[in-house]
Amino acid sequence: MAAGGRMEDGSLDITQSIEDDPLLDAQLLPHHSLQAHFRPRFHPLPTVIIVNLLWFIHLVFVILAFLTGVLCSYPNPNEDKCPGNYTNPLKVQTVIILGKVILWILHLLLECYIQYHHSKIRNRGYNLIYRSTRHLKRLALMIRSSGNTVLLLILCMQHSFPEPGRLYLDLILAILALELICSLICLLIYTVKIRRFNKAKPEPDILEEEKIYAYPSNITSETGFRTISSLEEIVEKQGDTIEYLKRHNALLSKRLLALTSSDLGCQPSRT
């Protein structure tokens, strides 16, 4: 009898605690409100304009370098024949090298800006686009850095053997043209990838994978099949997924708490 009384008291306490819980007594949030607050919103990458601007500045610099070198330094690079002596007291080659250095610094700053937005898109769960474009960004900067190294080597050779001055100018202009072509290829591939990504407006990678696995016919039944080639990429992908889920769960908890608090505030107090 005593045990039965304790069980009845325990069930009564549980029932009373449930009735007194304001969260359970609150009205359920509408479905469209949950969709609006909890569904991840797509944020496009705003880096295409920056990349196109960088390529345009690079193109203008190479054109001006060719015009300045051809019009002001041929046939003797040691003589400045520019109208009005615009480059005086500097030589034409010195002006071209200074412009190249300024262009490299500008590219480095814009690379930091692009990397900032790519880190943000990675934190939102878009790891595939991050991994597929990170080498393109680095490659473009490496091409320009390699061009600076070759130009430095040419200047060292010119300082030791100053006789064939026109040959050095031709080499400098050839390096600038080759660097422009290689950078254009990298930036063009990058622009196409980002535009396709922004146009598709996909959901985070983990949600896209859930859609794929929801249809068994789209999954290969081959034993040991892997879509990723190396173990390092698998570990990196799993780590990115775990980090995204942790951030996403924390964000959902904050939004749910805010929605519940606002909904409870709108409810009339019970007497």
Swiss-Prot record:
Record flagged with keyword Nucleotide-binding: no
Q: Which UniProt keywords apply?
A: Endosome, Lysosome, Membrane, Phosphoprotein, Transmembrane, Transmembrane helix
Kindly list the positions at which Phosphoserine occurs in this protein.
17, 229-230, 269
Residues crossing the lipid bilayer are: 47-67, 94-114, 139-161, 172-192
What subcellular locations does the record give? Lysosome membrane; Late endosome
Q: Which residues lie on this side of the membrane: Cytoplasmic?
A: 1-46, 115-138, 193-271
One Gene Ontology cellular component annotation? Answer: late endosome
Query: What main location does UniProt list?
Result: membrane
Question: This protein's superkingdom?
Answer: Eukaryota
Which membrane topology describes this protein? Answer: Multi-pass membrane protein
Q: Which parts of the sequence carry Phosphothreonine?
A: 15
Q: Which of the residues bear the PTM Phosphotyrosine?
A: 213
The record's InterPro entries line, in alphabetical order, gives: TMEM192
Intervals, Lumenal compartment = 68-93, 162-171
**Pfam families on file:** TMEM192
Q: Which family does it belong to?
A: Belongs to the TMEM192 family.
Q: How does it assemble?
A: Homodimer.
> What is this protein's name?
Transmembrane protein 192
| Organism of derivation | Pongo abelii (Sumatran orangutan)
